[in-house]
Swiss-Prot record:
GO molecular function: nucleotide binding; sarcosine oxidase activity
Effect of K172R: Retains 58% of wild-type activity
UniProt name for this protein: Sarcosine oxidase subunit beta
Organism encoding this protein: Corynebacterium sp. (strain U-96)
Annotated binding of FAD, by residue: G31, H32, E53, N61, M62, T66, I68, V197, G354, G357, K359
Length: 405
C-alpha cells in the first residue's frame, strides 16, 4: 500500500530508535543540524551520527524564518562564510537531488539617508573586493528592478538608492530541511525526533554523551545546533555563551498573482518583503526588545512593520494579513555567529546567528562538520570562535540585517 502513496515528507527518512552510542551526536534537528550531519557523512565519511530533535524535524526556526539568502556582508570574515554558503546553495539542488525552489531573484537593500548611502556604497565596494556580486543602484534603477516600490519624495523615508545582489534570493525552507534529512539518512545518519536533551554525560571536562527523554546516549563528540536554546544547552553542559535570545516575528498575506519580482530590505525602517512561490507576501521586521523563548511577540511590532511596508509599497494597502508567528533568535554582542570548540573537550557549538541563520545553513553545516571531524576550525569559521569575546577580535555586523538587533 505504501508503494502506491505519493512522496510525503514523513517517508523521506527513517525514524529509528536511538542506539546506545554514536561517534557524533548533533543536538538540534533544524537546517544547521541536518546540514552538519550531511557534510560529516559526505565530506568526512563519518556516518555513525545521530541528529536529535526535541520536537518534529525542522519545527523550530527552520519552519519560521523568511527564507532570504544573500552574502553581501561588510567584513571579510562574514563575506567569506556567507559567500561560501551561497555557492553551496547554488550546487545543492542537484547535489541533494531535491528541488527546494531556490530562486535567485536578487536582493535590494534600500538607503533612505545620506548616512545610509555612504554606508551602502562602502559595503558595495567591500563586497566587490571580496568577490561578492554587488551593485549600487540609483532610485530610478531601483524602480526598474522593482516597479512597485514607491520611490517618490513624498514619504517619510525617501528611497535614495539601494545595494543590489543579483545572485541572492529565496528558497523553500521546509523543502531544504527535507532534502538534507533525506540525503543524510541515505548515508546512514539516524534522525531521531521527539528526543529532547536534558543533560550531558561528562568525564571531568570531557563530554561522553547526552541524557535525553528517550534515554542516555553515549557519544564520542557532541555538537550543539539548537539556535535560540543554545544558551540553555550550554548551561546544562557547564559553561556560558555570550548570547541573548529574543522573539522575532514574521507574517504572510493572502495569496496574490506575482507582483513582487525581488526581495526588498530596509535596515532604516526595519522591514523586509518578498513574495513566496505560492503568491503570499512574506514580511519580517525588528526583534522584540525583551528576552524570551516564546515563539510569539508584541502586536506593536507588527503594526510598525505594516506602516513601513505600506508606505514603501502602496500596492499592498488593501492586502490582508493571513497569519503571524514568531521564532527565537540568538544574538551575540557583535551580531555574528559562533562556530567553535568549547571549554568542554569534544563539545562543539554553532549558535548566535541572529537573523542570518537560514542563509548560512550550508556554510554552517560545512564548517561545523570540518571542526568536528578535525577538532580544529575550518579557515572560514576560525574567526567565529568563542574566544573572540575574550580577545576583542569582534566582527561587528550590526548593520548587515534589516532588523534591529
Amino acid at each position: 500500500m505504501a508503494d502506491l502513496l505519493p512522496e510525503h515528507p514523513e517517508f523521506l527518512w527513517n525514524n529509528p530508535e536511538p542506539k546506545k552510542s554514536y561517534d557524533v551526536v548533533i543536538v538540534g534537528g533544524g537546517g544547521h543540524g541536518l546540514a552538519t550531519a550531511y557534510y560529516l557523512a559526505k565530506n568526512h565519511g563519518i556516518t555513525n551520527v545521530a541528529v536529535l530533535e526535541k520536537g518534529w524535524l525542522a519545527g523550530g526556526n527552520m519552519a519560521r524564518n523568511t527564507t532570504i539568502i544573500r552574502s553581501n556582508y561588510l567584513w571579510d570574515e562574514s563575506a567569506g562564510i556567507y559567500e561560501k554558503s551561497l555557492k553551496l546553495w547554488e550546487e545543492l539542488p542537484e547535489e541533494l537531488e531535491y528541488d527546494f525552489l531556490f530562486s535567485q531573484r536578487g536582493v535590494l537593500n534600500l538607503a533612505h539617508t545620506l548616512g545610509d548611502v555612504r554606508e551602502s556604497i562602502r559595503r558595495v565596494e567591500a563586497n566587490k573586493f571580496n568577490g561578492v556580486d554587488a551593485e549600487w543602484l540609483t532610485p530610478e534603477q531601483v524602480k526598474e528592478v522593482c516597479p512597485i516600490i514607491n520611490t517618490g519624495d513624498n514619504i517619510r523615508y525617501p528611497v535614495m538608492g539601494a545595494t543590489y545582489q543579483p545572485r541572492a534570493g529565496i528558497a523553500k525552507h521546509d523543502h531544504v530541511a527535507w532534502a538534507f534529512a533525506r540525503k543524510a539518512n541515505e548515508m546512514g545518519v539516524d534522525i531521531i525526533q521527539n528526543c529532547e536533551v536534558t543533560g550531558f554525560l561528562k568525564d571531568g571536562e570531557k563530554v561522553t554523551g547526552v541524557k535525553t527523554t528517550r534515554g542516555t546516549i553515549l557519544a564520542g563528540k557532541v555538537a550543539l545546533a539548537g539556535a535560540g536554546h543554545s544558551s540553555v544547552l550550554a548551561e546544562l553542559a557547564g559553561f556560558e555563551l555570550p548570547i541573548q535570545s529574543h522573539p522575532l516575528q514574521a507574517l504572510v498575506s493572502e495569496l496574490f498573482e506575482p507582483v513582487h519580482p525581488t526581495v526588498v530590505m530596509s535596515n532604516h525602517i526595519h522591514v523586509y518583503v518578498s513574495q513566496a512561490h505560492k503568491g503570499e507576501l512574506v514580511m519580517g521586521a525588528g526583534i522584540d526588545s525583551y528576552n524570551g523563548y516564546g515563539q510569539r511577540g508584541a502586536f506593536h511590532v507588527i503594526e510598525e512593520q505594516m506602516a513601513a511596508a505600506v508606505e514603501l509599497f502602496p500596492i499592498f494597502a488593501r492586502a490582508h494579513v493571513l497569519r503571524t508567528w514568531g521564532g527565537i533568535v540568538d544574538t551575540t554582542m557583535d551580531a555574528s555567529p559562533i562556530i567553535s570548540k568549547t571549554p568542554i573537550q569534544n563539545l562543539y557549538v554553532n549558535c548566535g546567528w541572529g537573523t542570518g541563520g537560514f542563509k548560512g545553513t550550508p556554510g554552517a553545516g560545512y564548517t561545523l562538520a570540518h571542526t568536528i571531524a578535525h577538532d580544529e576550525p575550518h579557515k572560514l569559521n576560525a574567526p567565529f570562535a568563542l574566544e573572540r569575546f575574550e580577545t576583542g577580535h569582534l566582527i561587528d555586523e550590526h548593520g548587515a540585517a534589516a532588523v534591529a538587533h
